[in-house]
Amino acid sequence: MWFDWILKRKNFLYLLKQIQIKNQQTLRPDFYSIVDVLGIVYFIIFYLIANSIARKNESNQLYKKYFVKGFYYKMIGSLGFYIIYAFYYRGGDSCTYFINGVVFNEYMLFQDFADGIRVIFSNITGVDNLPSWISNQSVYVYGEGYILRDTKALLVARISSLISLFCFNSYLVTCMAFGFLSYLAIFKLFSLFCRFYPSRVDGLSFAFLKVPSFIFWGSSVNKDTICVAMLCVLFYSFHKLFIEFKLYPKYLIALIISTYLVFSIKSYIVTSALPGLLMFAFVNYQNKVLSGALRRLFAPLMIAVGLLTFFLLYQSLSQTFTEFSEESLAVRAEGFKSDHMNIQERSGGSGYSLGDNIDYSPLTIVKKAPLALTIALFGPFPWQVRNVVMLLSSM
């Protein structure tokens, strides 16, 4: 029974692949094809699931008022991302993650099923540990195959392969699936914060569910979507385990998996979040145990403990992992800067400058922080607009 199902699925996927190949002369089949019409079907499926969740929690006003609306925003974000990257940019990191995920699926379904499972689920550390068929196909479908040489990007491609397998290798549907799955995690953390601040629900709903850039970058096949979703799971499961003391295996498993994925993709996020989590736990404990006067005395101590924890953690990681060393961070910062400047010169993107010959010492970082945060949060600025996409981003 299961063998027949797998065989039929392989035949159907093969048929879809042939349809994509036939459209190769008029379309870019790696990014969009006739298979994307399944997006309508998947939207209905995701809507029915979202509506079912809202009905199941109809006694909760948050789900009743915000859940389905937030779902619509996410789907709009996924569609917008798909349109811009598939039709305007015609590529990018997101498309590359997706393409290599499709290659993994094709290898598993049509070349070597057992080894394909190994490739997708094992901790691959580089292109040398991949089958030559995958390496050759990846180089063919996208430039130099650089994703396969980056362990973090390779993990994103493997996650994409798992999701795109159930989306019939459609980039549109895979973006929608990423957006929907991340939305479930985001709404969990949103509901938790609303318990902390019941008088600020409207503001929290805007921050979690309605900020355009947050929706756009968190609704597609990319690192940000995975990290945001897993960070929400990390915070939520941490609260359940260490604040509410609900010591259930599901929360422990969720905490371990989310921490692993975030640390593997963007390790600095875990480094930054850990002191905040510890302070959050300490504050909750002190509110339960100490009186008002003692709490006021205890607060500065907690801030000092949090800062000390961050400093010690950073020092430890910089010695253990070379990517946290000052030299490595400086090289990466210069790399990001030069990449953005190249994009600005080559394709009319927005660049930035924090000054020349920056030494990246702690004092310099503190001095440059206001300008860097302003650029990160509010750029590109209206006077930097060079095309329609930049105009939308600026708005």
Name the predicted role of every residue range.
Residues 49-54, 160-162, 174-196:
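Transmembrane-helix motifs of polytopic, lipid-linked glycan transferases
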Residues 215-216, 250-270:
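Membrane-interface alpha helices of multi-pass inner-membrane proteins
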Residues 220-223:
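Short acidic/glycine- and proline-prone juxtamembrane loop motifs at membrane-interface regions
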Residues 29, 130-177, 378-387:
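Juxtamembrane segments of multi-pass membrane glycosylation machinery
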